[in-house]
Amino acid sequence: MSVRRTLYTSVLWASAAAAAETSGPLEHVLVTIPLHKSTMETAFPVDALTGAELARETSSTLGDTIASLPGVHNASFGPGVGQPVIRGLSGPRVTSLQNGMRSADASAISADHSVAVEPMLADSIEVLRGPATLLYGGGAIGGVVNVVDGRIPTALPAEATLDVGWRYTGASHGQTGVIRAEGAIDNFAFHFDALSRNSDDVDVADGAGTDGMDYLGNTSTQTQSGSLGASYHFTDGFIGAAMSWLDSDYGLPEGSHEGSHEGSHAGGHEDGDEDDHDHESGHDEHAEEHGGEHEEHGDVRLAVDQLRYDVVMHLHQPMNGIELFRGFITLTDYEHTELEGDEIGTVYSSDSLEGRFELLHAPIGDIHGVMGVQVSDTNFSALGDEAFIPETDTRRLGLFVLEDWHAGDWQWEAGLRWDQDHIDPVGGVAARRRFNTLSASLGTIYEISADWHVSASVSRSERAPSTEELYSNVGNVTPESWIVHAATAAIELGNSGLDIERGVNADLGLRWHSDSAEASVAVYSNDFSNYINLANTGVIVAEAPVRRYVQGGAKFVGAEFDAKVTLGALNSRDIGLELGADVVRGELDSGDDIPRLPPLSGSLALTLGGEMDYYFTRVTAGSAQDRPGANEEPTNSWWRLDVGGEWRMMMGANAVDLALSLRNATNEEIRLSTSWLREYAPEPGRSLNLSFSLHL
């Protein structure tokens, strides 16, 4: 766990402002695990970003925002996409939630699809690893990321508040504006937020970008999002609803989709004309700024639209023996369009209805627990000349129970979950599949002393294959009929005969804390049978690499370390030292290394924090990844220097926050081994960032 140092509760998309150093670790109240009150009370591996720490780390993508946590990394696909990688696992093995319900986007379908969650609107982000993920599906073998944004007020605010923020990001010449308002009238609470972001092509290290330039072409982004929510509060609980929307347009770096313009079918259109259209975006201005040295030739862009409706009810003690009932219903209309130049390649659509209902029962002796049911119905389609996944209807039913038991210095936790997945390709283009999966976990935490705790857990998880793993290019049996996925410039071949993926996880941790410091270390292993892997076959068809979903045994082993300590004081400000490191290794039964794993990584930070200001210097480094997997490219070692300062000014009862930081101060060329585009798209170069916020 990390020591959390926050002086105030601020709007978390705004600047971090002044973070006060308090003695001892602060405990975050968990939303994702209803049984537990804080991160210190669970045997499960849990991390939470809140307050000033969240504001400091917030980025435009979810993966980049939480990449500072131990064991968590970012799988970028250009600056517009950042998917979380937890303990080496990603994609369908990591479940992204928004207020406890699935984000219901297409991020699990492909690495080029963004997670339809806006981190800059978050109040907190909770990351669960290990057995706790059973609450949200046995398929979340890697972990669960829950973004809590308060769009449905769970309590009546004491007074009306208005927060306005602005942020400038130097590397992308991007500007983000946010507004948030909350208030109450009698027993009704209200919430409103909105965000607008525009950025140009991102700058990278000298000579590392498009055609040897210092920028990545076609990486501009435009995003608008917001939500409107309300809740009615009564003696025994509340009921609330919210509507939210997301409209985003982002480009995939030039070079990442070479070969995709040769025609949508691998064996056809060998002399396909390249599109030569300009996009009405910030890309054009930025191209001119860099001398107009690159042109768009069928650049691939993704236009994302999502409309979401949420209903939530909490009832305290609805009947004898039940402490709390929690009900969640979410309706999502998601669509994104892959554009090549001005032409539509594929339109992805996902319409889903999901319900989740929990009962927290009263203690039975020393046993306390939660049980529930989760149901969903999703229609997914990919339409267009370049569509390579058939329309499918997916129905899911899940039953789960999680119990804990306290006995002296021991706390035990046990969970069980059963899921049934029906996946039905529309029109009979492939065989329908039904999967029954059963997952179980057992964990314990032992209090050695007031300062020392040791924890251990073991779980057995099962995951049903996903739609893209089963049905990508289904029915296209010859190379001439294979369809290239334009956004990734690859041919992706599914396997409708895939079996259930099974994993056995073991986790051992040691945690220490005192009034001025905290440290934790964990070691873990994941042993899979029927592990599903999108393997690079090494075959090239029509200039596109052929990747195939294959299945076999695999094993991951890893370790994490995290520590924070207050060294002393200087001019009434606390001097802090922060350390972190993690490593994971993965190998298939064939002896090949698992591709796109992060290398040995670490960070070291020196901080100085007072009541009204905060300063930091941080070095983050990654070793060379010389075990990239079969037919994959290795990456070099890298390091990054970040420095910054944050200040808070009071104007009566109102606060003004200002933050200034320099990220990648030495303009290093950084290529992440977790990125599918590491050969084409390095991470952003030197970036001078400025943020301002006003809290009324």
Tell what function each PLM region has:
Residues 25-57, 83, 91:
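N-terminal periplasmic "start-of-domain" segments of outer-membrane beta-barrel proteins
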Residues 63-105:
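Extracytoplasmic beta-strand/coil segments of soluble accessory domains associated
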Residues 290, 296-311, 318, 441, ...:
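Outer-membrane beta-barrel signature, preferentially recognizing the C-terminal barrel domain
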Residues 205, 460-463, 529, 647-696:
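C-terminal beta-signal and adjacent terminal beta-strands/loops
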Residues 367-369, 410, 518-528, 545-628, ...:
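Gram-negative outer-membrane beta-barrel transporters
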